[in-house]
């Protein structure tokens, strides 16, 4: 693991952290039981198999 050679100032640390942004999950349309829902792509298979409750929102 990389270790810093010098201490990083508080201002530099906070400005570096502020650049990090979370990305929104890409929603994909899926039809389950005749109803259309939008779910993240990683949950698509679970939604089709009925492993997650899509009516609870």
UniProtKB/Swiss-Prot annotation:
Q: Which GO terms describe its molecular function?
A: structural constituent of ribosome
One Gene Ontology term from the biological process aspect of the record: translation
* InterPro entries according to UniProt: Ribosomal_bL32, Ribosomal_zn-bd
What ranges does the record list as Basic residues composition bias? Answer: 1-19
Q: Which SUPFAM superfamilies match?
A: Zn-binding ribosomal proteins
Keyword annotations of the record: Ribonucleoprotein, Ribosomal protein
Q: Where is this region: Disordered?
A: 1-21
Q: GO CC: one term?
A: large ribosomal subunit
Q: Which family does it belong to?
A: Belongs to the bacterial ribosomal protein bL32 family.
Q: What is this protein called?
A: Large ribosomal subunit protein bL32
